[in-house]
Every structure is written in structure tokens, then in C-alpha cells.
Amino acid sequence: MSDTTRTAPGGADTLLAPEPKDETPKQTFVLAETTVPVDPNADTSVRPFEFRASDEALTDLKRRIVATRWPSKELVDDATQGVQLATIQKLATYWANEYDWRKFEAQLNALPQFVTSIDGVDIHFIHVRSQHANALPLIITHGWPGSIVEELKIVGPLTDPAAHGGTEADAFDVIIPSMPGYGFSGKPTELGWDPVRIARAWATLMDRLGYGQFIASGGDWGDPVTEQLAVLFPDRVKAIHLNMPSAVPPEILTAMQTGTQPTGLAPEEQRAFEQLSFFFDKGLGYANEMRLRPQTLYALEDSPVGLAAWILDHDDESYKMIARLFDGENEGLSRDDVLDNITLYWLTETAVSSARLYWENKLAFFAPQGVNVPVVISAFPTELYQVPESWAKAAFPKMIYYQRHPKGGHFAAWEQPQSWTVDVRNGFRSLRD
């Protein structure tokens, strides 16, 4: 696919960019030679990129899966002791015998991908320009244990809405970067790459692509990055969209920390409090290890099944959904979707480098950050918490759109791409007037 030249309509020049000239030859990186793009000149060029895993890397992956040394079965009938043996063995069997990385690799390489060096780190990103002249530039940030994989289903509906149930007036230019230490981006070699620094890098990226003003979206770690974009660059960031917003009132955070029950909560607020309490009480094992000792996770770089189990253990609802997938059910994601993401972590050797973001972060997660630009909120029921509208209004005084959904969880754009896309179209439509 290639970018399409277009002319901005009158009055919309601040949200549209001229076409950059990509004259650098496309670079292909083979895992056996290098795992991330290398920029020997540390310049500011934007270089076309594609990835092809070596046959040797894929053979080694299968060998390691088959050679897994399994622990004994859990002593309970549920997942309270962690990822269940039967689930991870079903995943491993499918991964070794049926999964096809090359299929996903071809899908990824069909999209325009680039790398550019920002603040000493090569940043990989997908950049798909819409053919429609009114397209709004939208940068979308993933989280952990996600990646650019979780955003791919929304690229077509955003850039070519007329072909996906929308109208030309709903078009977006889409930029999907891999965070530093994730996927095909470089691994930082110095301290300091927290959400604030990543937000600054994203602003540099958008400037480098020619976008003076833009909108942004994110979930999981993409939420604080997106919020910091709005806090640091309110004149450039016209609005943001969040599906796991930092909107928990201080008194609720205090109640969770002290183990007390807040009073006077509406039903949806009580449910959100219970979701958060469960996560903080039962679901932070992975986060505590990565926050305190990310370098200790050597096993994740050596065992693909160990990596898969670690990723599956992120949150209870996502684990249950994935377990059902490998029992033969279909709930928005497929088995291949799950393994595309896990295999990307494996082939890029980013289990530890991605975990360091937890160690680097100094922001109070879930606490409002003082965002003062228009905000669009998507609230999904099996997210870590389904943010109540009352909390969202209090956290974001300029909230312009809120939608509560009956289905969907932590990986919103991946699990429910249609619902996610409708929110983005509807939420940002007023910016086009």
C-alpha cells in the first residue's frame, strides 16, 4: 500500500499534513541478523520498514515449544493459582502444529511501516493515510501485554470508512507506533523512558510526519501516554480517546488502599469499585514483578510457553476469554490473534525490555492527570474497570462523548473493533465542523 496525495479543504489545514517524500529504500530485517531497526547515522529520516523472521527463528520457536518441561497440574479447579495447565498446553499444541506466523507477517508487511530515530531510539510505526481529503490524523498507542497487533483491525474502518459502514466524512489518517522496547522499535539503552518521555517522542513523530495538530487514542499504557500528550501539548492535541481512562476519584483510590468500603456509590460506581478492588487484590502479581524486578524475567526470553503464560495472566477476564478460545469458542478474538501477539514478543525478544516500562513509570495509575482538552470515553464491561460516566465527567471536565458498551474488555479495539470505531467516529465528529 502507498500513501495517496490529497488536498486539505479550506479551514482544515491545521489538522492535515502535506505528503512527505519517502525516498529511502525500504529496509528488510531478518531476525537472525538483527532484531530491531538500526540507524547508523542517528538522523531524522523516516525510513520504510518491513520484517521477515528467519526460517531458523521459526524452527527454533517450534523446537522450544515442543521441548517445554511442564509443571504439575494446579491443585484447584479454577485459575486462582494462575494460568491452568490444560489451557496453556492447548495453546502450545496449536502454536507448534497449526499456527502460521507467515500469514500474519504478510498481513503486517502489506501495511506502510516505517522507522525513525527519536531521542536515541528507533521508533517503528504504521502510517496509513486515508484517500479522503478531510481525514483527521490519529495516533493510537498500545499497552502491555498488547502491541500494534491489537490495532490492526481498525486500520481499514478508520482510513476507508465508506468501505466499512461509515462515510467519507469519518476518515482518519492512522499512525500506530510501537512503544520503545516493544515490537520492532528499538530497546532503550538509557534510563528515563516513561510515559511522559514516550508522549514527547510521539509529539516529535507527529511533527516529523507533518502534522501540526492531531488527535490521540490509547488504552492500558496507551492511556497515560495519550493523557500526557494532552497535558504537555494542549495546543497540538485537539482531543483524545481513552478506553481505560485515569478517572478513579481520590476517595476511591484511598478506599482501595485502606481496604474500606466507600459509601453512597451508585450501582455502576459500586461495580467499578469492586472490579478495581479485585484487580488490586488479586491481579497485580505480574505488575509488581515488572515494577520492582523486570530484569529478573530471563525465563520469558528463553521459554516461549513461559512467555505465553505470563502474557495470559495479565487480567482475569482476558484470561478467561482466551481459555475459551482454546476450548473452541469464538469471542471476537481468534487463537491466531492471540498467537500473533505472543509470537511478535518472542521474535523481537522484547519480553524484558517491554517490562521495564513498569519500572520506569512514576505516574499514579488510574488517578486523574489534569487533562484539559476534549475527551472521548469508551467504557467496556470486562476492562480492568468499566469507568462510570460520573467518574469520567469529574476526571475530564471537557468530556464530549461517553459510551458504555455491553460487551468487550481490556483489548477493546482488538476484541470489539466495530464498537471502538463507532465511538471514535462519533466522538471526534464535532472536530470536523
Predicted regions and their residues:
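Glycine-rich "HGGG/HGxG" loop immediately N-terminal to the catalytic nucleophile
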Residues: 101-103, 166, 179-193, 227
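Conserved hydrolase catalytic core segment
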Residues: 157, 161-164, 211-262
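C-terminal subdomain of alpha/beta-hydrolase-fold enzymes, centered on the catalytic histidine
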Residues: 281, 288-433
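Short beta-strand element of the alpha/beta-hydrolase
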Residues: 135-143
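Non-catalytic accessory segments flanking enzyme active sites
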Residues: 56-129, 134, 346-349, 353-366
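The serine-hydrolase catalytic nucleophile loop
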Residues: 144-156
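Conserved acidic catalytic loop of the alpha/beta-hydrolase fold
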Residues: 196-214
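Conserved alpha/beta-hydrolase
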Residues: 158-184
